[in-house]
Amino acid sequence: MPNRLRLVVFDVDGTLVDSRAHIVDAMESAFSGVGLPVPSREAILHGVGLSLPELMAQLVPDQPHSVHQTLSEGYKSASLARHMATGQDDTAVFFPGIREVLDWLRADDFTLMATATGMSRRGLDRIIMQHRLDGYFQTTQVADTHPSKPHPSMLYAALSDTGVQAEDAVMIGDTSYDMHMAKAAGLHAIGVTWGNHPVDLLADADKIVNTTDEL
């Protein structure tokens, strides 16, 4: 991996912010709402990073597409309701050291930043507002307008928007979906161990880091 890269692309859930409690609560509400057994916390968090329909299909593969869609809408409604009820600061907090990493990269005029997330546009905008990240990212790619990870569509769009070549860019994420997406698009890949997938699932990463200091 080069010593200096032009574009740094971040996953959001599990990489920048810890929203695990919020995700599990919203998922429990969605499944209870249609009378289905709630999946385990481990199963739910293992699928974080996929688009909602893909995640629901992974959690209940025996259910039809219509149920996956209903679950996805139920999750969105529960997520918004919890956000409105508890306030912004309760739903997605920065992992320790992330603010410093983002501020450090932003201060470097050479470096561009982007996001590639399985979140919706509304969800990402909420986090950007919550953490006052307006102007940090040159491009933000979300699940609303792309195939689910690990399809490389989001990274292709980020490269196109910034005019950066794949060999000059890195994807930073906490799941195997992020690593596979990066490799499919020709980007370097850094896996972080504080998120949702165990280190053995990050084997495709060029580097694995355990702390934001290492990052």
Tell what function each PLM region has:
Residues 58-103, 108-110:
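Metal-dependent phosphoesterase signature
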Residues 15, 27, 98-129:
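Substrate-recognition element of Asp-dependent hydrolases with the DxDx(T/V) motif
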Residues 32-37, 63-66, 108-109, 131-136, ...:
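Short helix-capping segments at alpha-helix termini
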